[in-house]
Amino acid sequence: MTPAYRAAALLAALAIAACASAPVTLVALPPAPAPEMRDAGPGPTVLLRKVTVPGYLDSFPVVVGRKGSVLAVSDSTEWAERPSLGVARVLRDALSQRLDAARVLIEGDGRIPDADLTVEFLALDPQEAVLHVDARWSFSCTAARGSRAGRSQFDVPLASATPGAVAAATTEALARLADVLAAAVPCPPRQYSDRKPTVR
């Protein structure tokens, strides 16, 4: 083996080792900013039951672009948590900022909500300079009869095709959706009686 061949082999081995040991950067959704206006008065309570995102987005590699059916994925950055969990967490927090924390229940709270809320994202896709959002949502009243469903479609500006920009745009999109949902809660507050049962 010639010295030149040995040197080339050593450089190749070092390059492979460097690639194998390159750390993966993790990115998380930032918290939603506080709204300019909020409904802090009494009102119906809401439990965010289920949030789903498309399966192609609900994995750890960060999708930074989409053109048609072709996805562009970051090769060095992953989500710090499964996207469906992060989306639900940030959306729940954004709702609590708009409706008051006491009105947005969490699993295991022990109280019966006035409304169950389900959200299905059909798209939460980074495209050319925008994050495209298409979400179906449904409120179901738990005491009185009634429900309300809708579909929200809009675009949020995307600063760049990078994981950090995608995370920031996703949180902005969730805050905008929370504005819509907070104004759409259809159910009246559950009426509780203050009377104590009579002991015979």
What kind of feature is each model-predicted range?
Residues 52-55, 94-99, 125, 178-181, ...:
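Sec/Tat-exported extracytoplasmic proteins
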